[in-house]
From Swiss-Prot:
<keyword id="KW-0131">Cell cycle</keyword>
<protein>
    <recommendedName>
        <fullName>Cell division suppressor protein YneA</fullName>
    </recommendedName>
</protein>
<dbReference type="InterPro" id="IPR022887">
    <property type="entry name" value="Cell_div_suppressor_YneA"/>
</dbReference>
<dbReference type="GO" id="GO:0009432">
    <property type="term" value="P:SOS response"/>
</dbReference>
<dbReference type="Pfam" id="PF01476">
    <property type="entry name" value="LysM"/>
</dbReference>
<comment type="function">
    <text>Inhibits cell division during the SOS response. Affects a later stage of the cell division protein assembly, after the assembly of the Z ring, by probably suppressing recruitment of FtsL and/or DivIC to the division machinery.</text>
</comment>
<keyword id="KW-0132">Cell division</keyword>
<dbReference type="GO" id="GO:0006281">
    <property type="term" value="P:DNA repair"/>
</dbReference>
<dbReference type="GO" id="GO:0051782">
    <property type="term" value="P:negative regulation of cell division"/>
</dbReference>
<dbReference type="GO" id="GO:0000917">
    <property type="term" value="P:division septum assembly"/>
</dbReference>
<dbReference type="InterPro" id="IPR036779">
    <property type="entry name" value="LysM_dom_sf"/>
</dbReference>
<comment type="similarity">
    <text>Belongs to the YneA family.</text>
</comment>
<feature type="domain" description="LysM">
    <location>
        <begin position="38"/>
        <end position="89"/>
    </location>
</feature>
<keyword id="KW-0227">DNA damage</keyword>
<keyword id="KW-0742">SOS response</keyword>
<dbReference type="GO" id="GO:0005737">
    <property type="term" value="C:cytoplasm"/>
</dbReference>
<keyword id="KW-0234">DNA repair</keyword>
Length: 105
């Protein structure tokens, strides 16, 4: 069966539009997912390990799992962070002043 030129154009446009919608939905849902977590600003002298030490000691979380989660969710290519960088960490926001530890794995 040979498709007409109009049919080919329709299928092509439909595919492009559907792909765009799927990409937008996946981007929006991942952004909303991260909105439930605490965001911190990196200070002078901070490292991923020093931040992990602060959180892991008080929340009984494995430091390696913490660093892996932070690197993944913040799309870090290296462990280098700079003052002023904003990082999402695995502490879920409960409300303005209270937080609970998120599941890291």
């Amino acid at each position: 069966m040979i498709m007409s030129k109009e049919s080919i154009i329709f299928v092509g446009l439909f595919t492009v539009i559907l792909s765009a919608v799927i990409l937008m939905l996946s981007y929006t849902s991942s952004g909303q997912e991260l909105n439930q977590y605490v965001k911190i600003e990196v200070q002078q002298g901070d490292t991923l390990w020093s931040i992990a030490d602060q959180v892991a000691d008080t929340k009984k979380i494995n430091k390696n799992d913490f660093i892996e989660w932070v690197a993944d969710k913040n799309q870090l290519q290296t462990s280098d962070i700079q003052p002023g960088d904003e990082l999402v960490i695995p502490l879920k926001k409960k409300h303005q002043d209270a937080y609970e530890l998120a599941t890291v794995r």
